[in-house]
Amino acid sequence: MKAVHLYEEIEIPQGINVNIEGMKIKVKGPKGEIEKDFSHISGIEIRKEDNKIVVETTFADRRKKAQFYSIIAHIENMFTGVTKGYRYYLKIIYTHFPVTVKVSGNEVQIQNLIGEKNIRRAKIMTGVKVNVKGEDIIVEGQDIEKVGQTAANIELASKITGYDRRVFADGIYIYKKEVIGSEQTD
């Protein structure tokens, strides 16, 4: 069944500037700037009215309804990112061969994973900071998508194939996600 009219107002928090050009949204706040392009989505209107962002569509089927609420979630994540930021925690796990992880330019280098001689590399997305502290890796940034993708890149680069995962648990795993400055964790 189609929803005849979907309308949502998102309050713009204080200290945040929003610029909307067509389906491109640019959000600027105290921690930085995020820009997202929703031009691949048709039939949904995004506009700024006073101190609110209005997202609106008509005759929405299941797909358009999902896109509508996804746009709203992206905008709210952008607001959180430019005011607080996001942080992911990863744990380096090894049993016999000590794994060495270091940040070099725009990549994370993983050495000696299960005794391998080759260096595994994971790409760091732009605008994301990666810190290695002992057996923990901390990934921080404003854009939740880039922070999550960087953490996933590190996790995938350390994935071991050809071994029983129940026996060989060596690798790097995400164990905590949080909004910087809040106690809420996922």
UniProtKB/Swiss-Prot annotation:
One of its GO terms (cellular component) is cytosolic large ribosomal subunit. It comes from the Archaea. It holds the Pfam family Ribosomal_L6. GO terms for biological process: cytoplasmic translation. SUPFAM superfamilies: Ribosomal protein L6. HAMAP family: Ribosomal_uL6_A. This is Large ribosomal subunit protein uL6. The lineage of its organism: Archaea, Thermoproteota, Thermoprotei, Sulfolobales, Sulfolobaceae. Belongs to the universal ribosomal protein uL6 family. Keywords: Ribonucleoprotein, Ribosomal protein, RNA-binding, rRNA-binding. Part of the 50S ribosomal subunit. This protein binds to the 23S rRNA, and is important in its secondary structure. It is located near the subunit interface in the base of the L7/L12 stalk, and near the tRNA binding site of the peptidyltransferase center. NCBIfam families: PRK05518.1, uL6_arch. GO terms for molecular function: rRNA binding; structural constituent of ribosome.
